[in-house]
């Protein structure tokens, strides 16, 4: 039962991170197209946002391992 729960948790985290990354990057590209002079600042903010979004699957993976070993 723990393996099923871990798989569902990882699926949700990966799906959410993929959608979130796609939205962040698409909005960053829209902003760069509108204001090219802010591309450096937008890129920096995008990397911070993507890093925070990617922390969700990593934390979910750790929790899934804890659930499976319980």
UniProtKB/Swiss-Prot annotation:
Organism taxonomic ancestry: Bacteria, Bacillati, Bacillota, Bacilli, Lactobacillales
Transmembrane segments: 4-24, 47-67
Functional note: F(1)F(0) ATP synthase produces ATP from ADP in the presence of a proton or sodium gradient. F-type ATPases consist of two structural domains, F(1) containing the extramembraneous catalytic core and F(0) containing the membrane proton channel, linked together by a central stalk and a peripheral stalk. During catalysis, ATP synthesis in the catalytic domain of F(1) is coupled via a rotary mechanism of the central stalk subunits to proton translocation. Key component of the F(0) channel; it plays a direct role in translocation across the membrane. A homomeric c-ring of between 10-14 subunits forms the central stalk rotor element with the F(1) delta and epsilon subunits.
Signal sequence, start to end: none
Lipid bilayer topology: Multi-pass membrane protein
Family membership: Belongs to the ATPase C chain family.
Site (Reversibly protonated during proton transport): 54
GO cellular component: plasma membrane; proton-transporting ATP synthase complex; proton-transporting two-sector ATPase complex, proton-transporting domain
Name of the featured protein: ATP synthase subunit c
UniProt keyword list: ATP synthesis, Cell membrane, CF(0), Hydrogen ion transport, Ion transport, Lipid-binding, Membrane, Transmembrane, Transmembrane helix, Transport
GO molecular function, one term: lipid binding
Annotated Pfam families: ATP-synt_C (PF00137)
InterPro entries: ATP_synth_csu_bac/chlpt, ATP_synth_F0_csu, ATP_synth_F0_csu_DDCD_BS, ATP_synth_F0_csu_sf, ATPase_proteolipid_c-like_dom, F/V-ATP_Csub_sf
Subcellular location: Cell membrane
Keyword Cell membrane assigned: yes
Quaternary data: F-type ATPases have 2 components, F(1) - the catalytic core - and F(0) - the membrane proton channel. F(1) has five subunits: alpha(3), beta(3), gamma(1), delta(1), epsilon(1). F(0) has three main subunits: a(1), b(2) and c(10-14). The alpha and beta chains form an alternating ring which encloses part of the gamma chain. F(1) is attached to F(0) by a central stalk formed by the gamma and epsilon chains, while a peripheral stalk is formed by the delta and b chains.
NCBIfam families: ATP_synt_c, PRK06876.1
Protein's organism: Lactiplantibacillus plantarum (strain ATCC BAA-793 / NCIMB 8826 / WCFS1) (Lactobacillus plantarum)
């Amino acid at each position: 039962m723990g393996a099923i729960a871990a798989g569902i948790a990882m699926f949700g985290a990966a799906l959410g991170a993929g959608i979130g990354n796609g939205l962040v990057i698409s909005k960053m590209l829209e902003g760069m197209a509108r204001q090219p002079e802010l591309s450096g600042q937008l890129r920096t903010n995008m990397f911070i946002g993507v890093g925070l979004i990617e922390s969700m699957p990593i934390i979910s993976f750790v929790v899934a391992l804890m659930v499976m070993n319980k």
